[in-house]
């Protein structure tokens, strides 16, 4: 993604507002459907620390349980992402309508603390913001970290790098790209089960006839992956494509991606094929699968990620 300008604004003064609990509107986490918004309330713990209470659903149609009745690690990652957007909007005053651009996203889940058990799970996310660069009194880029707790147990951790763009600056950066992209799949999906999915409508890969390479299958009608008009393919869809490719190369047992290290290099555009390649990495642990996944479009790298985790079945 394009580099941000050099930022030299001083850090503004900010009251801590410690221990004031605030409810969460779904617009603060960039969702339009309540069932896809997971944070419930937040409180500022310090200048750059926030506590967010969230609920992981047990019956979400897209983020369904995986493996041996575990919450999907990508659901946990999405809860992290939403908690970060909430902290920056509500805690730092970044206006709604600004663009939230992740360039890095790493997470580690502890599956022994992610059992579903047939009911929603309440979690607490501590959000840490650091290395903030400021422009006109607002953060323009920075890093964010998460610690996810289920009761007194650490269920996951994560770190990310992010940038923020005003609507005007974003349109200038994007140039002539249409504001609203529409994409309907023209190719058949791969079979759902080997890709780690139960429903064919959630499959985001099409076969190419080449081993370890698929075409990204983009359907802007998907209610969870496309919440509102967008001018590029969302990062959530790219992560899902990576998971599905990893399942396909891992073999019949698939993979539960409890760890991920992801870099987003540029936008994936509508109207041009994006090729997803996956290769199993060598490892000494027979119970863990590690897969490197990359996305390429028009000869450029869109994203790269390394997913690791136990086999989903067996």
UniProtKB/Swiss-Prot annotation:
Q: What Pfam families does this protein map onto?
A: AfsA (PF03756)
The GO terms describing molecular function are: transferase activity
Instruction: Name the catalysed reactions.
Output: a medium-chain 3-oxoacyl-[ACP] + dihydroxyacetone phosphate = a (4-alkanoyl-5-oxo-2,5-dihydrofuran-3-yl)methyl phosphate + holo-[ACP] + H2O
Q: Which InterPro entries match?
A: AfsA-like (IPR047757), AfsA_hotdog_dom (IPR005509), HotDog_dom_sf (IPR029069)
The UniProt keyword set, sorted, is:
Transferase
**EC numbers, comma separated:** 2.3.1.277
Temperature remarks: Optimum temperature is 15 degrees Celsius.
Q: Does the keyword Transferase apply?
A: yes
- Summarize the pH-dependence annotation from the UniProt entry: Optimum pH is 6.5-7.5.
Annotated TM spans: none
Q: Which domain of life is it from?
A: Bacteria
Asked whether the keyword DNA-binding is assigned, the reply is no
Q: Which family does it belong to?
A: Belongs to the AfsA family.
Q: What does this protein do?
A: Involved in the biosynthesis of A factor (2-isocapryloyl-3R-hydroxymethyl-gamma-butyrolactone), a gamma-butyrolactone autoregulator that triggers secondary metabolism and morphogenesis in Streptomyces. Catalyzes beta-ketoacyl transfer from 8-methyl-3-oxononanoyl-acyl carrier protein (ACP) to the hydroxyl group of dihydroxyacetone phosphate (DHAP), thus producing an 8-methyl-3-oxononanoyl-DHAP ester.
Binding partners and assembly: Monomer.
Protein name, UniProt field: 2-oxo-3-(phosphooxy)propyl 3-oxoalkanoate synthase
Q: Which organism is it from?
A: Streptomyces griseus subsp. griseus (strain JCM 4626 / CBS 651.72 / NBRC 13350 / KCC S-0626 / ISP 5235)
Recite the lineage of the species: Bacteria, Bacillati, Actinomycetota, Actinomycetes, Kitasatosporales
């Amino acid at each position: 993604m394009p580099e941000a300008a050099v930022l030299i604004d001083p850090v503004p003064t900010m009251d801590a507002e410690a221990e004031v609990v605030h409810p969460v509107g779904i617009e603060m986490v960039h969702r339009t459907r309540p069932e896809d918004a997971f944070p419930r309330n937040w409180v500022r713990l310090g200048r750059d620390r926030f506590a967010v209470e969230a609920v992981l659903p047990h019956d979400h149609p897209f983020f369904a349980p995986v493996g041996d009745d575990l919450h999907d690690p990508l659901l946990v990652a999405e809860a992290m992402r939403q908690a970060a957007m909430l902290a920056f909007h509500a805690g730092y005053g970044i206006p709604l309508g600004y663009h939230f651009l992740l360039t890095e996203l790493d997470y580690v889940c502890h599956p022994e603390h992610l059992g579903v058990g047939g009911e929603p799970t309440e979690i607490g996310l501590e959000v840490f913001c650091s290395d903030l660069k400021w422009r006109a009194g607002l953060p323009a880029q920075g890093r964010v970290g998460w610690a996810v707790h289920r009761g007194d147990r650490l269920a996951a951790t994560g770190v990310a790098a992010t940038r923020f763009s005003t609507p005007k600056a974003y349109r200038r950066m994007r140039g002539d790209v249409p504001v609203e992209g529409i994409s309907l799949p023209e190719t058949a999906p791969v079979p759902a089960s080997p890709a780690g999915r139960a429903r064919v409508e959630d499959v985001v890969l099409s076969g190419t006839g080449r081993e370890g390479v698929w075409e990204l299958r983009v359907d802007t009608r998907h209610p969870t992956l496309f919440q509102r008009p967008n001018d590029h393919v969302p990062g959530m869809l790219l992560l899902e494509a990576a998971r599905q490719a990893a399942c396909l190369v891992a073999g019949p047992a698939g993979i539960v991606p409890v760890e991920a290290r992801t870099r987003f290099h540029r936008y994936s555009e509508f109207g041009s094929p994006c090729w997803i390649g996956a290769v199993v990495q060598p490892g000494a642990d027979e119970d863990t699968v590690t897969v490197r996944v990359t996305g390429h479009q028009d000869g450029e790298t869109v994203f790269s990620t390394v997913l690791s985790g136990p086999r989903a079945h067996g």
